Amino acid sequence: MDKMKYNFTCRLFTDTKCFGPGVAQLLHTVDRLHSLRAAAAEMEMAYSKAWNIIRNSEAALGFKLLHSSTGGKGGGGAFLTEDAVKLLTAYEGFCASMRDYGDSIFDDAFGWLERKL
C-alpha cells in the first residue's frame, strides 16, 4: 500500500477567490516572457482567458498586477507592477510556511493510520 500523503493548495480570498497557484504561475510566466499573449500561449490558454484571470484578480485585490503596452514600432509588452511582485513574494513565502507546518504536524495527526495501512 502507498504511503499516506496530504495535498495543500494555497488560495487567497476577499469576497471571492482572488489569488492562487494559477494566477501566480501566469504572473511568473509574464515576468519571464514580458508578454501576456506569449505567457498564455506557453500555458496553452486563450489570451482572452489570461486577461480575464488578471482582470478578475485585480478587481478582487483592488490594485493592478500588470503594466502593459500595446504593440507597434517599439513592440508591446507586459511587466509586473511593484504590488504584483510584493504579492507573489508574500504568497509564495506564506504557502511555503504553511506546507512546512503541514509537514511537521501530519505524522502526529495521522501516524496511527499509517500503521494500519
Language-model segments: which ranges?
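Short helix-boundary/capping micro-motifs
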Residues: 30-40
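Residues within the DNA-recognition helix of helix-turn-helix
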Residues: 53
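Central "turn" residue of the DNA-binding helix-turn-helix
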Residues: 44-46
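Residue cluster at the C-terminal edge of the helix-turn-helix DNA-binding motif
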Residues: 59-64
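Helix-turn-helix/homeodomain-like alpha-helical modules used for DNA recognition
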Residues: 86-117
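Basic, amphipathic "hinge/linker" alpha-helix immediately C-terminal to the N-terminal HTH DNA-binding motif
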Residues: 68-93
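Short, Lys/Arg-enriched N-terminal segment that forms or immediately precedes the first helix
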Residues: 2-15
